[in-house]
């Protein structure tokens, strides 16, 4: 086996040199039989080229790379000169697209540092390494086109949302999301039986993919692992806002910037008070049935909605009425976490208070009322603080980063003196 550097075993090159010498003799014999001046010039040109090429090949057999002779193309130099593969591994592995000739390449070469191994490499019997492209899935380094192509595999053909595990496919391999599958009688793609075979391989791939938020078209720039995607979307500040008024009569949805305009245009009866401390006066609290009282409070360049809701509790033993008071911010949950509200009932040396973080209108007040995560009291307690059927609630809203105001009668540990 020959050495690519020409350090020994140059039999291949000697054969080529001998062939070129014979060609040179043929050129000289042809030129001796010619007496024309033009052929003589041609003879000199061929003779010089042949001598130069022979000298270059001799130099290369001694370890010097041959230059391309004038008048002869690189392709002509390749004829009969392709060396055998070296027995010793190269110092650097290259991903080559083209033909290797005398230690050079005729096309683009992408080199890797010595000792490194490219991704997905396989070695053939001739010692040539073939390299398959490594495409990152949904992570840094993947192009937008490749990421979009991979994500398209997870699109449900019915709702066009991204499917989350578990993945169920039909006998033909067609997928449908878990939300749409119970509503289908057959596969929406091939009309075969409803997808019922679990695709475990796709679930493993999904663990490496970052899925965009459902509301990315509305401006959300975040991507998530499939396990965190649903939780984020429930509180994403880019999701459509529902009408914050209690009750199910208004089905409006829109952007955050449109909420106040909707309230002023559709719910004109709602009163807005300015300031951090106001009195929320609910009139006619003795009205039968379920009743809601709503008021707006504007401060710190934000708008808050105050809700007092009365519900009938149909207990066969003792029917009662319950009141629930809560404050929600016209904004996101992240913004709501910057504030604290305080509700207080006081009359005849009695006082009842509640302090908490405002609810975001994304969260609504339904869950807070169901869990009694608000100021809750029954009709008997309401009568203790009401006057002529009207109930006044003191509402104070404070920023968390500012000292909160205290009631004059409240004492803290710092106010106590010890002997």
Swiss-Prot record:
EC number: 2.3.2.27
Pfam families the UniProt entry points to: Sina_RING, Sina_TRAF, Sina_ZnF
Binding site for Zn(2+) 1: 213, 220, 232, 236
GO molecular function term, any single one: zinc ion binding
Keywords: Metal-binding, Transferase, Ubl conjugation pathway, Zinc, Zinc-finger
UniProt zinc finger (SIAH-type) residues: 208-268
Chain spans, region SBD: 205-400
Record-level GO BP terms: programmed cell death involved in cell development; proteasome-mediated ubiquitin-dependent protein catabolic process; protein ubiquitination
Family as reported in the entry's similarity comment: Belongs to the SINA (Seven in absentia) family.
Biological function: E3 ubiquitin-protein ligase that mediates ubiquitination and subsequent proteasomal degradation of target proteins. E3 ubiquitin ligases accept ubiquitin from an E2 ubiquitin-conjugating enzyme in the form of a thioester and then directly transfers the ubiquitin to targeted substrates. It probably triggers the ubiquitin-mediated degradation of different substrates.
Protein name: E3 ubiquitin-protein ligase siah-1
UniProt organism field: Caenorhabditis elegans
Lineage: Eukaryota, Metazoa, Ecdysozoa, Nematoda, Chromadorea
Gene that encodes it: siah-1
